[in-house]
Amino acid sequence: MKVRASVKKICANCRLIRRKRKILVICVNPKHKQRQG
């Protein structure tokens, strides 16, 4: 899980999701997991 100021989709499988005021990226590739904060 990477914590970043700017969260972006890295590949076509990445999905942007909002959970409890946090923006997450969930993907098939575990390296693409990100959250903002």
Curated annotation (Swiss-Prot):
<dbReference type="GO" id="GO:0005840">
    <property type="term" value="C:ribosome"/>
</dbReference>
<dbReference type="GO" id="GO:0009507">
    <property type="term" value="C:chloroplast"/>
</dbReference>
<keyword id="KW-0687">Ribonucleoprotein</keyword>
<comment type="similarity">
    <text>Belongs to the bacterial ribosomal protein bL36 family.</text>
</comment>
<keyword id="KW-0150">Chloroplast</keyword>
<dbReference type="InterPro" id="IPR000473">
    <property type="entry name" value="Ribosomal_bL36"/>
</dbReference>
<protein>
    <recommendedName>
        <fullName>Large ribosomal subunit protein bL36c</fullName>
    </recommendedName>
</protein>
<dbReference type="InterPro" id="IPR035977">
    <property type="entry name" value="Ribosomal_bL36_sp"/>
</dbReference>
<keyword id="KW-0934">Plastid</keyword>
<dbReference type="Pfam" id="PF00444">
    <property type="entry name" value="Ribosomal_L36"/>
</dbReference>
<dbReference type="GO" id="GO:1990904">
    <property type="term" value="C:ribonucleoprotein complex"/>
</dbReference>
<dbReference type="GO" id="GO:0006412">
    <property type="term" value="P:translation"/>
</dbReference>
<keyword id="KW-0689">Ribosomal protein</keyword>
<dbReference type="GO" id="GO:0003735">
    <property type="term" value="F:structural constituent of ribosome"/>
</dbReference>
